[in-house]
Swiss-Prot record:
Keyword Isomerase: yes
TPR repeats: from-to residues: 222-255, 274-307, 312-345
Protein name as it appears in the record: 41 kDa peptidyl-prolyl cis-trans isomerase
Main location: cytoplasm
Swiss-Prot/TrEMBL keywords: Cytoplasm, Isomerase, Repeat, Rotamase, TPR repeat
GO CC annotation, single: cytoplasm
InterPro entries, A to Z: Cyclophilin-like_dom_sf, Cyclophilin-type_PPIase_CS, Cyclophilin-type_PPIase_dom, TPR-like_helical_dom_sf, TPR_rpt
Reactions catalysed: [protein]-peptidylproline (omega=180) = [protein]-peptidylproline (omega=0)
Location(s), subcellular: Cytoplasm
Signal peptide residue numbers: none
Length: 375
């Protein structure tokens, strides 16, 4: 075993089990740099296990139950205030605060674990995870670890809606601790979910060595995401199916370089963009998410090479959703166009007839009301 392997084996590996809005979101596993910043790493490790008991402020020295109280997209997610919960509190295992150990490591990439502070020598329990490189923090905050797995969970937190940088849904460290034995050794091994998906949720996290994904790789991943979504749909797991289709679209949105790709790659990417958007529209229909259904259908319709069959399908799904948000005029336009493209489609014909019938009834009612008013 190399000396590098020895060092990595000696590094602590700890975990957070996260809930968002009361629902399980997944596990984040961190590797701590005990070999570079041992005091800082030990503080975090012990706060994950809770082994130090109650602190001087009367609260358990434990991250369990605390939240990510500050989230700034394209910057970082911050947590660790288990005393006040709002960024004003926290306590280290050494007392209220401890000194900056060293600034040897730089904030040169996403998914680094670093100490939050209120100035030099004010480290407590608060920490942040970078979601982009943040070089302006070098020399001011101590980097002491990195995310080994669970990057998608970090991204979920990063993408939460916020009010004054505070997430509108609570992102809670429901459980935390230290990994040991086989669990620690395998912590950085990618594992597939129930549908076979082992890709990162966001394409920038799937890329290696800072190199953008090739068009062929994006095509494969997005195709796989469609298959994962189809499996989830057949299993009746509609929210997961929707997530998989939307994940595939995130990869397609990378707009890869096509110069050195096979001639039909763009055609395949466009066809996949249509089907993923159309499938997402269907999931949103079934979940009664009408605005999202319209946006997904519009995504399919925006592809210039969409076939008449797929256009009719997307127009129907858009029209169906427009009816449900009481946008009758837009629904009529969508459904009329869909019927021109697929005049024998029973669902389109029936929905259009229902909209016209409702419109006629509304007009008759309005006419009767006006007549009564002027009589």
């Amino acid at each position: 075993m190399s000396s590098t392997d020895d060092v990595k084996q000696a590094r602590s590996r700890v975990f957070f089990d996260i809930t968002i809005g009361g629902k399980a979101a997944g596990r984040i596993v961190f590797e701590l740099y005990n070999d570079i910043v041992p005091k800082t790493a030990e503080n975090f490790r012990a706060l994950c296990t809770g082994e130090k008991g109650v602190g001087k402020l009367g609260k358990p020295l434990h991250y369990k139950g605390s939240t990510f109280h500050r989230v700034i997209k394209q910057f970082m997610i911050q947590g660790g205030d288990f005393t006040a919960g709002n960024g004003t509190g926290g306590e280290s295992i050494y007392g209220a605060k401890f000194e900056d150990e060293n600034f040897q490591l730089k904030h040169d990439r996403p998914f680094l674990l670093s100490m939050a502070n209120a100035g030099p020598g004010t480290n407590g329990s608060q920490f942040f995870v970078t979601t982009v490189p943040t070089p302006h923090l070098d020399g001011k905050h101590v980097v002491f670890g990195e995310v080994l797995s669970g990057k998608s969970v970090v991204r979920q937190i990063e993408n939460l809606k916020t009010q004054g940088d505070k997430p509108t849904k609570d992102a809670v460290i429901a459980d935390c601790g230290e990994l040991s034995g086989d669990a620690a050794v395998s912590a950085d091994t990618k594992t597939a979910d129930a549908y076979g998906d082992e890709y990162e949720d966001f394409p920038e996290d799937e890329a290696t060595d800072g190199q953008p994904l090739s068009a062929s790789k994006i095509l494969k991943i997005a195709t796989d995401c469609k298959d994962f979504g189809n499996k989830a749909f057949k299993a009746g797991d509609l929210p997961v199916a929707l997530d998989k289709y939307q994940k595939g679209l995130r990869y397609l949105n990378e707009d890869p370089e096509l110069d050195n790709e096979p001639a039909d790659t763009k055609q395949k990417l466009d066809a996949l963009r249509v089907s993923l958007n159309s499938n997402a529209a269907l999931m949103n229909m079934k979940l009664s998410a009408w605005d999202e259904c319209i946006r997904s259908a519009d995504g399919a319709l925006a592809v210039a090479t969409i076939s008449d069959k797929d256009r009719a399908k997307a127009l129907y799904r858009r029209g169906y959703a427009q009816v449900r948000i009481k946008d009758e005029d837009s629904a009529l336009t969508s459904l009329e166009e869909a019927k021109k493209l697929a005049p024998e489609d029973g669902a389109i014909v029936n929905e259009l007839a229902a909209v016209k019938k409702a419109a006629a009834a509304r007009m008759a009612k309005e006419k009767a009301a006006y007549k009564k008013f002027f009589s």
